[in-house]
C-alpha cells in the first residue's frame, strides 16, 4: 500500500523538517518488507480566506485534488479516536489488507478540517488530548509510521 502524507502549511528548513524527514526515510526503507511504502508528502499553502469555514473548505479542496482515485483517507483531528502504537500498526495492517492501493494521512490547517472530509474519511485519529503545533504533528506521525512498520515486522525498535 502506498501511503501519502498531506499537510496544510509548509515545513521550513530546520530541525523539525530534518527529524520528520529522518523518520520518513526510515519508514520508506523498512516499509516495503510489510507491504507499505511512502508514496509522497504533499504540502499546501494555508488558505488566506477571511473566515474559518471558507479556509477549511479551500484546504479540503486541495486535499481532494491530492487524493488518488479510490484512496483511503485517515484524518488527524483533535476530535478523532486515540490509538496506542500497536493499535495504529494494526489499523495500518488492516487498511493494507483491504485491497486498496493508496492511503492518504491528512494534517489539517490551524482551523481544523472541513466537515465534508470527516464524512468521507475512513478513520479519524488524534495524537492525544493535548494540542500540538503542526510541525510536531508531522514528526509524531512520521515516527508512528516507522514504529508501525517495526511492530508489523517484529523489529525490536518498539519495546512495549
From Swiss-Prot:
<feature type="binding site">
    <location>
        <position position="76"/>
    </location>
    <ligand>
        <name>S-adenosyl-L-methionine</name>
    </ligand>
</feature>
<feature type="binding site">
    <location>
        <position position="108"/>
    </location>
    <ligand>
        <name>S-adenosyl-L-methionine</name>
    </ligand>
</feature>
<keyword id="KW-0698">rRNA processing</keyword>
<keyword id="KW-0808">Transferase</keyword>
<dbReference type="InterPro" id="IPR003742">
    <property type="entry name" value="RlmH-like"/>
</dbReference>
<keyword id="KW-0949">S-adenosyl-L-methionine</keyword>
<dbReference type="GO" id="GO:0005737">
    <property type="term" value="C:cytoplasm"/>
</dbReference>
<comment type="function">
    <text>Specifically methylates the pseudouridine at position 1915 (m3Psi1915) in 23S rRNA.</text>
</comment>
<dbReference type="GO" id="GO:0070038">
    <property type="term" value="F:rRNA (pseudouridine-N3-)-methyltransferase activity"/>
</dbReference>
<keyword id="KW-0489">Methyltransferase</keyword>
<dbReference type="InterPro" id="IPR029026">
    <property type="entry name" value="tRNA_m1G_MTases_N"/>
</dbReference>
<comment type="similarity">
    <text>Belongs to the RNA methyltransferase RlmH family.</text>
</comment>
<keyword id="KW-0963">Cytoplasm</keyword>
<dbReference type="Pfam" id="PF02590">
    <property type="entry name" value="SPOUT_MTase"/>
</dbReference>
<protein>
    <recommendedName>
        <fullName>Ribosomal RNA large subunit methyltransferase H</fullName>
        <ecNumber>2.1.1.177</ecNumber>
    </recommendedName>
</protein>
<comment type="subunit">
    <text>Homodimer.</text>
</comment>
<dbReference type="InterPro" id="IPR029028">
    <property type="entry name" value="Alpha/beta_knot_MTases"/>
</dbReference>
<feature type="binding site">
    <location>
        <begin position="127"/>
        <end position="132"/>
    </location>
    <ligand>
        <name>S-adenosyl-L-methionine</name>
    </ligand>
</feature>
